[in-house]
From Swiss-Prot:
Protein name: Probable manganese-dependent inorganic pyrophosphatase
Family: Belongs to the PPase class C family.
GO molecular function, one term: inorganic diphosphate phosphatase activity
Entry binding sites for Mn(2+) 2: D15, D77, H99, D151
Record localization: Cytoplasm
Species: Streptococcus uberis (strain ATCC BAA-854 / 0140J)
NCBIfam families to which the protein is assigned, alphabetical: PRK05427.1 (NF003877)
């Protein structure tokens, strides 16, 4: 088989980078594939912390497989085409490892596809190492642990699967770190928003979902102080409005998540605010509302929006 590119979604978070990096190593060493990990964007500050901590070089960024002379790819941490490579419809998808809903996805040929309702794609990749009796290098264990911590907010998110606790313990042992101490350091690294412009802030961790003909952008930022983020509301709303016009989104929903108290403030703009309000049974005041206990876009925001939009 010719060269295969392995990558996570656009605007990659820690799980996207970690799972793709680890899967590329697995593909080369267990499946004997000519696999290269790449990324669909630069690592965010949280991911950069993990990469630096474990001495791993960030994957190079690509936009097109064809431009790389590659026609076969493997996706991790996503499957929806609008979240993937620009020419994803023109290449062969050899495999997918994911933990999200399956939507807006089809292939011309059969493929290897593993989708599980667990806390992270990294959790699945780690299990695949064990199934193939492949030793997990320390730095890869550290990255996989980071992906799991990031996606589950240190195992506090409702997306956390009962098996994720054991996975986290095993990976922490392999990586040589204290789970709680390293976990908090990692999460705090991702809350430094002061250096970000508003345009950067709303794009740190953002995904587009096609909901009944509407392109709904759902972004999330982590913080230890929601009020501090809302001090920038006017400028954030300007950035959101610009993105709506430029990218053609019908709606933009920003989750401002307090990682300490496990709550979120929802800031939303667009043409379907009635559906956003109905999704969460709240009333937007000055374009935002409090959503207690909400920390997961995948489980506590997207399904509710999907139902409300009738998608």
């Amino acid at each position: 088989m010719s060269k295969v590119l392995v990558f996570g979604h656009q605007n990659p978070d820690t799980d996207a980078i970690a799972s793709s990096y680890a899967f590329a190593y697995l593909a080369k060493n267990a499946y004997k594939m000519d696999a290269e990990v790449v990324a669909l964007g630069e690592p965010n500050e949280e991911t950069a912390f993990a990469l630096d901590y474990f001495g791993v070089t960030a994957p190079r960024v690509v936009e097109s497989a064809k431009a790389e002379g590659v026609d076969t790819v493997i996706l991790t941490d996503h499957n929806e085409f609008q979240q993937s490579l620009s020419d994803i419809s023109d290449v062969t998808i050899f495999g997918v490892v994911d933990h999200h809903r399956v939507a807006n996805f089809e292939t011309a040929n059969p493929l290897f596809m593993r989708v599980e309702p667990v806390g992270s794609a990294s959790s699945i990749v780690y299990r695949m190492y064990k199934e193939n009796n492949l030793e997990v290098p320390k730095e890869i264990a550290g990255l996989l642990l980071s992906g799991l911590i990031s996606d589950t907010l240190l195992l506090k998110s409702p997306t956390t699967h009962m098996t994720d606790h054991k996975v986290a313990e095993e990976l922490a042992n392999l990586a040589g770190v204290n789970l709680d101490e390293y976990g908090m350091s990692l999460l705090k690294a991702g809350t430094n928003l002061a250096s970000k412009s508003e345009a950067e802030l709303i794009d740190i961790d953002a995904k587009t979902f096609e909901l009944n003909g509407n392109a709904v952008r759902v972004a999330q930022v982590n913080t230890v102080d929601i009020a501090e983020v809302l001090e920038r509301q006017d400028a954030i709303e300007t950035a959101i409005s610009d993105a709506i016009v430029k990218e053609g989104y019908s709606d933009f929903v920003l989750m401002i998540t307090d990682i300490v108290n496990s709550n979120s403030e929802i800031l939303a703009l667009g043409s379907n605010m009635d559906k956003v309000e109905a999704a969460f049974n709240f009333k937007l005041e000055n374009n935002h509302a409090f959503l207690p206990g909400a920390v997961s876009r995948k489980k506590q925001v997207v399904p509710q929006l999907t139902e409300s939009f009738g998608a």
